[in-house]
Every structure is written in structure tokens, then in C-alpha cells.
């Protein structure tokens, strides 16, 4: 019996640890401030008793997380504490400059792993190993970590990227309720026990934003579908569909209210996990539509009806066992829900097919009642296992990112906790074997490897003893003889053997192992393995059959004939698929047993863990009843002893968890030499201050040692800067030791170096920014000058093109004007032909004229319209020349020029006639002139030529014509 700290339920064996209760009472009376210790390394002295007292004090004060060096101890509160996991608290830990200085929390571990990924310190990939007994809170811890990363690792800038990140986050979080519904069950110790192991990779891109995730599962306990221990339940999903289905769905799935199913024990228990709507909504977010969901639930209902098929023993061995009368309805319903023919389903369960002889003759043998039950259970386990694997693949396809879109990952390992039940079989052996491997990983990585490395590197270190579980692992998986090898050998030999014979073989072959125990008082064949968490008795009955996990090929062929769309996808027909029966005389492939497959997958997992930086969270269960505010010291003490927590605290308090090689240390922190330049420029320095020397492979150690010393000389400067900023913890850093090949330091020293590096990088960034701004300014000026030059050239080119177009247009206009002027001259000549002949015939010929003068005069006469124009022009030829042209155009008789005088007053009045003015009244007979604009009196400005004058007059040519005419007359 267990002794309870608060005085309730005292046990008969409590005297063995009576001193613990006395120490506890003394603690409760005097050491009331012990609960304020956030790190167990500060407990003095570090013993199991003092650690236990500190944990209990913090548990009673509702403080459930405590640091133990590199490990976080998490106590299960067994009550909801919503304020402890709010998004605001997540952001507070994420935004804190030093989250390790806040209260211990699972978010501290999450933020530390996230910052390690951002720092790119090798190994960059991180892993968090959550371990503990069943019911200690491992699944809840993993769920909180996933929510934390979903909040802090998805902060893109653009709205579109934010929506994508939000969708990825929602899908990752929705994978939890689906996998818990199909993979978790209620056990004796835990209402939500994981019946499978899972390793979740949260994938991060180069900007450390979560782009996806991948889930890998290990060893689903599929036997729970058909076999549940006393006071335990089946998987949650079966209870969800029975309690949460609607009336129409109940009719469709043949699940009437209050129906009893053999594979659904304890249905009256109401658990928080029996929420059907949460599962359906999560499946919908993962891309599983409603018709597919209904198909899945229909198949699960078919499995429940399949479990109600009970057979009656046959009196004749040659006749198959017939189902009982009340099971015939279940046969019809199961066949209908699974899409199988009723008679074929019953026949495959009742009759076994045997192939024998060289010709592979087929024999049909009726099965006994026990074998019929086994084949029925095998059919159900096969369907459920395939369905679970299909769900995992759907989840991965929904949340997994492309390979080229992520570079690093953070792994979350959540496996079944250590189990010890009254009846333990192969499932418990594999589960405890996995816990032994994880414990060995912790021991090898932290307890043993660190101390051995201290000795190799030449550090002064006193070796601390610890509990090594290597003998237990040698017993389970050792070579050449171990428990697993003996069980696999029985499967390969395929010979009939009883449970007692297997027990004898194990006890005889492994008698020398200190971890193998005997229980001679037990009536059932069994053996005892002393695990790190305590001894466990395993029954050998059914051990070999479970390890074989035989699947009759006729059952697979039966499911390939199903008309159900889901089962058709789970069991596709492959004509190239090889049958399990091989012709005699040919070598058979080695039998792949359950233990072999589980061991191979576990080795792959450990390889991934070894390639990452591990972080450990130890979940502790305060009591086995799941009651809040109840702290059972015996149970907690056994868990502390099993996980080696005290040894971990000792090593963490005196050790150096940070180890960096000399080369990596110099590469990362060589910038700190800028804070103390005299170390690299003094007379004793081997290198000038111009920079680091080139490394030579032959003298690397001699090259790195002075550089490391230069970096260490900057520590006083960093300490002084930390003191100025008011950080007393960093002002007094823990010591640092330089080994032969590595530098060892504590977390506080690493934080101090990182702060100094950040300062130097900030200075370098400012220098680079200033240089970049100058360079950018010069580039902008150069580009501006180039732009101005290009613009000037373009403008010049455009101007030339414009002038060329104007010249071309002027040429076209000039030619058109010349053509038009010629037409007008011809038109005027035709109009005055008659007048010209008349004047020339009546004129006296007393004046002798030369031919040249006659031609010039004729030319002037033909231009008489110009006389009309010039008489009223404001600019042009002189007044005398103008009158001369007018006289020539009027064709007056050749005589004395003085006898014919042109009236200037009339000229000034704007009236010009080609005849002498009459002395009396006269009548004007006007007709429309063929000349355009002849009826408009021009009124030009003194300095412009407009209208008809602009078209007809060309100043230089008129002057030339009148000058020529005057010369001819002279």
C-alpha cells in the first residue's frame, strides 16, 4: 500500500519510510519558502527527500513546473488550469528577452528550442522527449507545445501569407483530436491513454516560420479493438459514434439507442474525450468530407456488429461451427455495413484454407470455436489497422509541406508511458521496451556521455554514479540471445509450443541476467523483467501468436471483394501481389514479426533523436487515482528514482551542458575581439589587429588557442556591460573551461557571450548601414546624372525630328502654294485677255518700244491683280515703285507719265479702278469675281500679313519683280 503525504489512507508498510513523513511535517512547519525554488539544483542538500519536499510544496501551491537542470519536471495537476496555457502567456514567454528567468513552464522549453533553431548552432534541428508513466500528462504536454509553436512560429507579414499560415496551424492542431479519437483509449491509470507512439516533426522554413508538419506512428495497439482488459474501454471513436450519432445516422449504421456490443465495455462512463462533434469538425478541416466520414463510421459500426458474432461449438469436427441464434442478425448487419456477401463472410470465418503438397492442393478445414473467434478478431484488427494508417496518411498529406519549402524541424516525441498491469502481454513488453530505449538515450546523452567527455577533455571532474539500464536492454534485445530473439525464433520455427515451454526456454537461456526474475508462486506461465521503473510480470500465453500477427490470405481476399468504397481503397486488388504461400522447395522470406518491425522503427526514431539537440520533459503523476491536490509520496518517489532525477540534478548543478568545438567557438565568437582590440594588437599577440589569420590544417590547434584566449579576455568587458545594464545574474557568470578540443560552459555563460555577440553585430550592422547609405546616395546621384543626360539627348532628338517634320510640311505647303498661284495667274489671264487686246489695238504707236520692254510690260500686265493688292498694303515696295506697278497694270496709253495721275486719295481710300475716273455719274455693273476673298477689304496691322495677303505676297520676290519692271521701263 502507498502512504499519502496528507495523512489519509496510511499503509501497513509506511514504517519503511516513516522518516519521510517526519521530514515532511518539519518542512511544512518551518521551510515555508521552499516552494519558491524554481530549480531543484538550488536545493541543499540534493537528496531524494529534499527534492520530494520541494516538489510537494510547489504542487500544493499550484506550481506544477520545476526545473531540474537540463530537465523540466511537470506534475500533473489533474484539474483544468486554463490561465496556465493562455495565448497571452505564450506570447509573454516568446517576447521575453530571457525566458529562462521567468517561471518554469513547458513554454520555456518550447521557446528555448525555437531560439536554438534561429541561432543555427549545430545541430540545428531540435527534439523534445516527453516521458513518464501512463497518465502523467505526456499527451497534454505535447498538445500544449504544438499550440505554442502554432502561435509563435506563424507570424508572416502579408495578409495572404497570414491566411496560409493560419490554415496550416489549424490543420496541425486539428490532427490531435482525430488521432486521439482513433488511437487513444481509457485504461486503468489514464482516461486518455495513448495506445500508439507518435513523433511529430514541426517543419520550419528559412524564416523560422512553421510551414507544415509530419506525423510518424509506432505500434498501434490494434488488439484493443477485439480484446479489452477488465475496467478498460475500447478506442474513443467507438463510444463517440454510439453516443453522438443522430437518429438518421443510427438507422443508417444500425446503432439503436442502448444497444449492447461485446467490444464496447463500460459504455456508461462519460468522458470528456467522447465528443463526436469535435472529431467530425477536425476531420472536416483535414480534408475528409462528410460522405467519407459517414463511410468511415459505417465501417466502424460494422466492426461493432462483427464483434457480436458468437459461435457455438460443433459436435462434429468435420462440420463448421455455426453462429448462435442471436448472432445471425449481427452477421447480416456486419456484412451489409462492410459491403460483403453474408455467406462468404461467414464461410471465411468458419473455414480455414490450407495449401499442401508440390501441386499446392487446396484443403478446406472447418475451424474450432476458438479459431473462429480468432479469425473474426483478426478481420476486425486488420480493418482497423488499415483504417488508422490511412488516416495518418491523409493527415500527413494535409499538413506536410513540400520538401523544398522547409529546412529545419522541431520534433515532439509522445509515446506510451511505462505500463504494469495485472495481465501484461506483448503490447506491454514493446511499450516498456520503448521506454527503456528512451531512458537509455537520456542516460547515454546526458548522464554517461557528459561525464565521460569531461574526463576525455581533461576537466577536473568527480564521477557521479547513476542507474544504468543497459543490463535490462541486453535482456530484452541483446545479441545473440534475448527475450525478443527467443520469441522470434519460436515464430520462425513455426512449431507447436506451449506457454510453459517458452517460459522454460527464457529462464534457462537468460538465467545469468540480473534483470530477469522468477515468480514460482504464479500458476500461469510468466517471467519477470526488472525495468528501470520497476519489475513487470509478463504472461507467455499468446505471446508467440501475437508476435506472428498472422493474417490469413483468404481474409485479405475477402476484403478485396468488398463493395464499400472505403474498403476498396484500403484493400486494392493487385494482380502482381505475391501470396504468402510459397511453393515447396523454394527459400522463404524471413518472417517479419511484430517485435522485429517495432525494433526497426524504434532504431530509426533514435537515429533522428541522435541527430538533434534533445530536450527532456519528465512528467510525474502525483497519484494513481487522478485526484487533484493529492500527493502520494511513495508513487512520486518511485518515479523520481526510476528516471534518475537526483543524478540529473547533481550533474546539472556541477556540469557544463553547453559544449562547442574550438573551431565553431572561434567562428561564432571571433567578433568579440572587437570589444578588446588590445588583445590582438599588443606585442605579445601572435597576430596583428588586421584580422584573423588563415587556418592551416597542420597547425590548427596552435592557431585556435591564442584566438580563444583573445575571446576569453573580452569576458571582463562583457561582465562590466552586463553590470551597467543592471543584470546581476549575467554580471557574475559561471566559469568556463577549455578542453582539448571543446569549450565547456553553462547556460549563463552562453547567454553572456550571445549578448556580447549581439552588441558587436549591432555595431557592425550600423557600420554596414552607413556604408550602404553612402553607396546608395552615390549611386542615386550617378543615376540622376545619367537620367538628366539621357533626357537632354532625347529632347534634342525630339526637337530635330520636329524641325524635320516642319521642314517637310513647309515644302509640301510651298509646292501647293506655287501650284495654286500658277492656276490663279492663268485664271486672271483668261479673264483679262479681251481687255488686253482691246487696249493694245487702240493705243498709239508713236512710242517706239523694244521687244524686251514689251515682254516685261506684258509680264507686268499679267500680274495686274497684284496691283490691286499692293495699292492697299501697309508694307512692301516703296510708294514710287508701287505707283509704277499700278500704272503698268492699268495699261494706260503710252505718253507722258504726268498726263495720267493716279489719285492717291482714292488709293488711300482703298478704291482702285483699271479705268480713268469719269466726270459724271456712272453705273457699276458688278459680277462675282472668280478670285476667292475678292469681296473682302483687307485691314492688316502694320506689322503682320494675314488672310489673302499672307498667301499671295512674298516680300522678297515682289521687290525683285518690281525692280526688274522699273529697269525695263527705264
From Swiss-Prot:
Expression (tissue specificity): Widely expressed in multiple tissues and cell lines.
GO BP term (any one): regulation of cytokinesis
A molecular function GO annotation: ATP binding
Localization of this protein: Mitochondrion outer membrane; Cytoplasm, Cytoskeleton
Key words, A-Z: Actin-binding, ATP-binding, Cytoplasm, Cytoskeleton, Membrane, Mitochondrion, Mitochondrion outer membrane, Motor protein, Myosin, Nucleotide-binding, Phosphoprotein, Repeat
Phosphoserine carried by residues: 685
Residue span of region MyMOMA region: 824-970
Domain of life: Eukaryota
Effect of residue 923 to A: Does not affect localization to mitochondrion outer membrane
This protein's record includes keyword Translocase: no
Binding site for ATP: 132-139
PROSITE patterns: IQ, MYOSIN_MOTOR
Limits of the IQ domain: 759-779, 783-812
Residues covered by region (Actin-binding): 602-624
Residue ranges occupied by any Myosin motor domain in the UniProt entry: 35-758
Function: Actin-based motor molecule with ATPase activity that localizes to the mitochondrion outer membrane. Motor protein that moves towards the plus-end of actin filaments. Required for mitochondrial inheritance during mitosis. May be involved in mitochondrial transport or positioning.
PANTHER family noted in UniProt: MYOSIN (PTHR13140), UNCONVENTIONAL MYOSIN-XIX (PTHR13140:SF289)
Self-association state and partner proteins as the record states: Myosin is a hexamer of 2 heavy chains and 4 light chains: interacts with myosin light chains MYL9 and MYL12B.
Family designation: Belongs to the TRAFAC class myosin-kinesin ATPase superfamily. Myosin family.
Name listed for the protein in its UniProt record: Unconventional myosin-XIX
Source organism of this protein record: Homo sapiens
Amino acid at each position: 500500500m502507498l502512504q499519502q503525504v496528507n495523512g489519509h489512507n496510511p499503509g501497513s508498510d509506511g514504517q519503511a519510510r516513516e522518516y519521510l513523513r517526519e521530514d515532511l511535517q518539519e518542512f511544512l512547519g518551518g521551510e515555508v519558502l521552499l516552494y519558491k525554488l524554481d530549480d531543484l539544483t538550488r536545493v541543499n542538500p540534493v537528496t531524494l527527500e529534499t527534492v520530494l519536499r520541494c516538489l510537494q510544496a510547489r504542487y500544493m501551491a499550484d506550481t506544477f513546473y520545476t526545473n531540474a537542470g537540463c530537465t523540466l519536471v511537470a506534475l500533473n495537476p489533474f484539474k483544468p488550469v486554463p490561465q496556465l496555457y493562455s495565448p497571452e502567456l505564450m506570447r509573454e514567454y516568446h517576447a521575453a528577452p530571457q525566458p529562462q528567468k521567468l517561471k518554469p513552464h513547458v513554454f520555456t522549453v518550447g521557446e528555448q528550442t525555437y531560439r536554438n533553431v534561429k541561432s543555427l548552432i549545430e545541430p540545428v534541428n531540435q527534439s523534445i522527449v516527453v516521458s513518464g508513466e501512463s497518465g502523467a500528462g505526456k499527451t497534454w504536454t505535447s498538445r500544449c507545445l504544438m499550440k505554442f509553436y502554432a502561435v509563435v512560429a506563424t507570424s508572416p507579414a502579408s495578409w495572404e501569407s497570414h491566411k496560409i499560415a493560419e490554415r496550416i496551424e489549424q490543420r496541425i492542431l486539428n490532427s490531435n483530436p482525430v488521432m486521439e479519437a482513433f488511437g487513444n483509449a481509457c485504461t486503468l491509470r489514464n482516461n486518455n491513454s495513448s495506445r500508439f507512439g507518435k513523433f511529430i516533426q514541426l517543419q520550419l522554413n528559412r524564416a523560422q516560420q512553421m510551414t507544415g508538419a509530419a506525423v510518424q506512428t509506432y505500434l498501434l495497439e490494434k488488439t484493443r479493438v477485439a480484446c479489452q482488459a477488465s475496467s478498460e474501454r475500447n478506442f474513443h471513436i467507438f463510444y463517440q459514434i454510439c453516443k453522438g450519432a443522430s437518429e438518421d445516422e443510427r438507422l443508417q449504421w444500425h446503432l439503436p439507442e442502448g444497444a449492447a456490443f461485446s467490444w464496447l465495455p463500460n459504455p456508461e462512463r462519460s468522458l470528456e474525450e467522447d465528443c463526436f462533434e469535435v472529431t467530425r469538425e477536425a476531420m472536416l478541416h483535414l480534408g475528409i468530407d462528410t460522405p467519407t466520414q459517414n463511410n468511415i463510421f459505417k465501417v466502424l459500426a460494422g466492426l461493432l456488429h462483427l464483434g457480436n458474432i458468437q459461435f457455438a461449438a460443433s459436435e462434429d469436427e468435420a462440420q463448421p461451427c455455426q453462429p448462435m441464434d442471436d448472432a445471425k442478425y449481427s452477421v447480416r448487419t456486419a456484412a451489409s455495413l462492410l459491403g460483403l456477401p453474408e455467406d462468404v463472410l461467414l464461410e471465411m470465418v468458419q473455414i480455414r484454407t490450407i495449401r499442401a503438397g508440390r501441386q499446392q492442393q487446396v484443403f478446406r478445414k472447418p475451424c474450432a470455436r476458438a479459431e473462429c473467434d480468432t479469425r473474426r478478431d483478426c478481420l476486425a484488427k486488420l480493418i482497423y489497422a488499415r483504417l488508422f494508417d490511412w488516416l495518418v496518411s491523409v493527415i500527413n498529406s494535409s499538413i506536410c509541406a513540400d520538401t523544398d519549402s522547409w529546412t529545419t524541424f522541431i520534433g515532439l516525441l509522445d509515446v506510451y508511458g511505462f505500463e504494469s498491469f495485472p495481465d501484461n502481454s506483448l503490447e506491454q513488453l514493446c511499450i516498456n521496451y520503448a521506454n527503456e530505449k528512451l531512458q537509455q538515450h537520456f542516460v547515454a546523452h546526458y548522464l554517461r556521455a557528459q561525464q565521460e567527455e569531461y574526463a576525455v577533455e581533461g576537466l577536473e571532474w568527480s564521477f557521479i554514479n547513476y542507474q544504468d539500464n543497459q543490463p535490462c536492454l541486453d535482456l530484452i534485445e541483446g545479441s545473440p540471445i534475448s527475450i525478443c530473439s527467443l520469441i522470434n525464433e519460436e515464430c520462425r520455427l513455426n512449431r507447436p509450443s506451449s506457454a510453459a515451454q517458452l517460459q522454460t526456454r527464457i529462464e534457462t537461456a537468460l538465467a545469468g541476467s540480473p534483470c530477469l526474475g522468477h515468480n514460482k508462486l504464479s500458476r500461469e506461465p510468466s517471467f519477470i523483467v526488472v525495468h528501470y521503473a520497476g519489475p513487470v510480470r509478463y504472461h507467455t500465453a499468446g505471446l508467440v501468436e501475437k508476435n506472428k500477427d498472422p493474417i490469413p490470405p483468404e481474409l485479405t481476399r475477402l476484403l478485396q471483394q468488398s463493395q464499400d468504397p472505403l474498403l476498396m481503397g484500403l484493400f486494392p486488388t493487385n494482380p502482381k501481389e505475391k501470396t504468402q504461400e510459397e511453393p515447396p522447395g523454394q527459400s522463404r522470406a524471413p518472417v517479419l514479426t511484430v517485435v522485429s518491425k517495432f525494433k526497426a522503427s524504434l532504431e530509426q526514431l533514435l537515429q533522428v533523436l541522435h541527430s538533434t539537440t534533445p530536450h527532456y520533459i519528465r512528467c510525474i503523476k502525483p497519484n494513481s487515482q487522478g485526484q487533484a491536490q493529492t500527493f502520494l509520496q511513495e508513487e512520486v518517489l518511485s518515479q523520481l528514482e526510476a528516471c534518475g532525477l537526483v543524478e540529473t540534478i547533481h550533474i546539472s548543478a556541477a556540469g557544463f551542458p553547453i559544449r562547442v568545438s574550438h573551431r565553431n567557438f572561434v567562428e561564432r565568437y571571433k567578433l568579440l575581439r572587437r570589444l578588446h582590440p588590445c588583445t590582438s594588437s599588443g606585442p605579445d599577440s601572435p597576430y596583428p589587429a588586421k584580422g584573423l589569420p588563415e587556418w592551416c590544417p597542420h597547425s590548427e590547434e596552435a592557431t585556435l588557442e591564442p584566438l580563444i584566449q583573445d575571446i576569453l579576455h573580452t569576458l571582463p568587458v562583457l561582465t562590466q556591460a552586463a553590470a551597467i545594464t543592471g543584470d546581476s545574474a549575467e554580471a557574475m557568470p559561471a566559469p568556463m573551461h577549455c578542453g582539448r578540443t571543446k569549450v565547456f560552459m553553462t547556460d549563463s555563460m552562453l547567454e553572456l557571450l550571445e549578448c556580447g555577440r549581439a552588441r558587436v553585430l549591432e555595431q557592425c550592422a550600423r557600420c554596414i548601414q552607413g556604408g550602404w547609405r553612402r553607396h546608395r546616395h552615390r549611386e542615386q546621384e550617378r543615376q540622376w546624372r545619367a537620367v538628366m543626360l539621357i533626357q537632354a539627348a532625347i529632347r534634342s532628338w525630339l526637337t530635330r525630328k520636329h524641325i524635320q517634320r516642319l521642314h517637310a510640311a513647309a515644302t509640301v505647303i510651298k509646292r501647293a502654294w506655287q501650284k495654286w498661284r500658277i492656276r490663279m495667274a492663268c485664271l486672271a489671264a483668261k479673264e483679262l485677255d479681251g481687255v488686253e487686246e482691246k487696249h493694245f489695238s487702240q493705243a498709239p504707236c508713236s512710242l517706239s518700244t523694244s521687244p524686251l520692254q514689251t515682254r516685261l510690260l506684258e509680264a507686268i500686265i499679267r500680274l495686274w491683280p497684284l496691283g490691286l493688292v499692293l495699292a492697299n498694303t501697309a508694307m512692301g515696295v516703296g510708294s514710287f515703285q508701287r505707283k509704277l506697278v499700278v500704272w503698268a497694270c492699268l495699261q494706260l496709253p503710252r505718253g507722258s507719265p504726268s498726263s495720267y495721275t493716279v489719285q492717291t486719295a482714292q488709293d488711300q481710300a482703298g478704291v482702285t479702278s483699271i479705268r480713268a475716273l469719269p466726270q459724271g455719274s456712272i453705273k457699276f455693273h458688278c459680277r462675282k469675281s472668280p478670285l476667292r476673298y475678292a469681296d473682302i477689304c483687307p485691314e492688316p496691322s502694320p506689322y503682320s500679313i494675314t488672310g489673302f495677303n499672307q498667301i499671295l505676297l512674298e516680300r522678297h520676290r515682289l521687290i525683285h519683280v518690281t525692280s526688274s519692271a522699273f529697269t525695263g521701263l527705264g
